[in-house]
């Protein structure tokens, strides 16, 4: 009997030592520094991408290179906000000049796409400034949740959060660069053939002449030279980067939240078939509240970004799909058109599918609760079950729509219906080569 008591005391002593070691490590991680940087946190996963984004005036945060998220703050008097202001000024001038040219020539469903692209870019710069202002209120609770769930009793996932973020983000970046290069290649080919067939007096066709036409809004206020061409590439690239980063940021955020909810579900699932004291259910329910509060905070801060992203993607898909049955002039035009359309569809689907994992993972603990025997169904279990089913957990666009699988297929059905209607309305003839 005494031997059994000694074994129990030793077991409890070892358990208390492990708990104290975990608490001490959590405390050191909460102070920032090397211990926190070595953890697989969401801040550590997205920090390299935020550093790159600041070169384009996105997410104007101070001390973004710091390993401690407590040092990263939004400041009005900062270099990051000054860079954002510069992009807003230059982008605003480009948008106004472009709008003036379009209104002079006459607006239609085809040429307004470029103006919408610029306006969406301006709105997104402002949206990311707003998100940067609430950064500290989001990232500090998120980091505390990361510290909580990267130690026992929670288990880490098979793949690290950083590897998931890197694979998806870098894949989108590489495909986006290809799309951007094909845009210029297709435009230059069309311009060259147009000059050859319509202006026989032009003996030389250079890329510079194409850029003068492509950046006509910039040449409207600047002389044509190497500086204005580089400026045009730079500003156009910034708008393109912002357009892609908007979706990448939603994807990265969705991966970060979904992974924590999956870890939480795994902890609850590990209790299946075991007698669980009410105190443990209380601890689990308290952790779930922290997770849901974090998800709600992120959803409220990102609603404008999600709304603009989905609305813009749907508009561009509709506009591009309208030209599916249009006979294009050159092979490079076909390559660019299909590459761009498929890439946009894939990127939009990626946004919905990754974001839907948040909601799916938040409901996983219900499976384990349904297996709790009736004699173990306590008041805490009932509260936890009510908590899981009481409200939606995930991302949305101002609560007008939620990013779920059902929303994705509903959007695709709407696109097909809308596209069929547009194809009936669009009665323009594309025959012949216009030499305007």
From Swiss-Prot:
The entry's keywords: Cell membrane, Glycoprotein, Membrane, Receptor, Transducer, Transmembrane, Transmembrane helix
Membrane-spanning parts: 79-99, 112-132, 165-185, 215-235, 238-258, 305-325, 335-355
Membrane topology label: Multi-pass membrane protein
Subcellular location: Cell membrane
Cited InterPro entries: Gustatory_rcpt (IPR009318)
Disulfides per UniProt: none
A molecular-function term among this protein's GO annotations: taste receptor activity
Family: Belongs to the insect chemoreceptor superfamily. Gustatory receptor (GR) family. Gr5a subfamily.
Protein name stated in the entry: Gustatory receptor for sugar taste 61a
Organism per entry: Drosophila melanogaster
């Amino acid at each position: 009997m005494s031997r059994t008591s000694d074994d129990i005391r030793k077991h409890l002593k070892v358990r208390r030592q492990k708990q104290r070691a975990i608490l001490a490590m959590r405390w050191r991680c909460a102070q920032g520094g090397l211990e926190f940087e070595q953890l697989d946190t969401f801040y550590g996963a997205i920090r390299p991408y935020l550093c790159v984004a600041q070169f384009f005036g996105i997410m104007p945060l101070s001390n973004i290179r710091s390993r401690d998220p407590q040092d990263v703050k939004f400041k009005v008097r900062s270099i990051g906000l000054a860079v954002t202001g510069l992009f807003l000024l230059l982008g605003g001038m480009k948008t106004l000049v472009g709008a003036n040219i379009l209104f002079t020539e006459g607006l239609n469903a085809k040429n307004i796409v470029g103006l919408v692209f610029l306006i969406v870019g301006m709105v997104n710069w402002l949206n990311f400034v707003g998100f940067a202002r609430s950064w500290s209120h989001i990232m500090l609770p998120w980091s505390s949740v990361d510290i909580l769930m990267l130690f026992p009793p929670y288990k880490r996932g098979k793949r690290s959060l950083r590897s998931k973020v890197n694979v998806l983000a870098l894949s989108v970046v590489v495909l986006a660069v290809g799309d951007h290069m094909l845009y210029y290649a297709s435009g230059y080919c069309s311009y060259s053939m147009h000059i050859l067939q319509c202006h026989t007096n032009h003996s030389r066709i250079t890329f510079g002449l194409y850029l003068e036409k492509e950046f006509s809004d910039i040449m409207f206020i600047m002389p044509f030279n190497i500086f204005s061409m580089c400026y045009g590439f730079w500003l156009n690239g910034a708008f393109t980067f912002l357009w892609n980063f908007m979706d990448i940021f939603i994807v990265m955020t969705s991966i970060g939240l979904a992974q924590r909810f999956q870890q939480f579900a795994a902890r609850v699932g590990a209790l299946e078939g075991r007698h669980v004291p009410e105190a443990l259910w209380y601890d689990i329910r308290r952790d779930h509240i922290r997770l849901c509060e974090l998800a709600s905070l992120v959803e409220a801060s990102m609603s404008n970004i999600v709304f603009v992203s989905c609305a813009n993607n749907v508009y561009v898909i509709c506009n591009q799909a309208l030209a599916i049955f249009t006979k294009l002039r050159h092979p490079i035009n076909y390559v660019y058109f299909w590459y761009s359309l498929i890439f946009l569809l894939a990127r939009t689907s990626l946004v919905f599918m990754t974001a839907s994992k948040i909601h799916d993972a938040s409901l996983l603990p219900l499976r384990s609760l349904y297996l709790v025997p009736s004699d173990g169904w306590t008041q805490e279990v009932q509260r936890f079950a009510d908590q899981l089913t009481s409200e939606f957990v995930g991302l949305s666009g101002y609560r007008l729509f939620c990013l779920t699988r059902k929303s994705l297929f509903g959007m695709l059905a709407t696109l097909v219906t809308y596209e069929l209607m547009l194809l009936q309305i669009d009665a323009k003839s594309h025959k012949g080569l216009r030499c305007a």
